[in-house]
């Protein structure tokens, strides 16, 4: 499940094996893309780099010891680090 949440101006997805929701704000995508993206741009970038986003979410869950149902967000730094590892 990946959706654009216009109420919070963020992309939301369910990390594997986690009951909470992970969000990535449009401003994080702005840093990643180097321009202010549309929601469609954000979804396209997520789709093209889904493995890295999911890896970043898993790393944050582990690093922070998040509860199984905790909601959380990824920053552009979280995603950039995961993209570097995924390549």
What do the predicted segments below correspond to?
Residues 11, 22, 72:
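A broad, low-specificity signal marking well-ordered, structured residues that form hydrophobic/aromatic
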Residues 1-18:
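Short, charged/polar N-terminal "headpieces" of proteins
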Residues 16-33:
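Short N-terminal mixed-charge amphipathic segments
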Residues 39-87:
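Acidic, low-complexity intrinsically disordered segments
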């Amino acid at each position: 499940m990946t959706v654009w949440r216009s109420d919070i101006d963020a992309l939301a997805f369910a990390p594997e094996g986690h009951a909470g929701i992970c969000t990535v704000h449009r401003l994080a995508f702005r840093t990643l893309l180097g321009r202010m993206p549309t929601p469609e741009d954000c979804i396209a970038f997520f789709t093209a780099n889904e493995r890295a986003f999911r890896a970043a979410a898993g790393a944050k869950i582990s690093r922070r010891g998040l509860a199984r149902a905790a909601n959380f967000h990824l920053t552009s730094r979280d995603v950039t680090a995961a993209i570097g590892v995924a390549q």
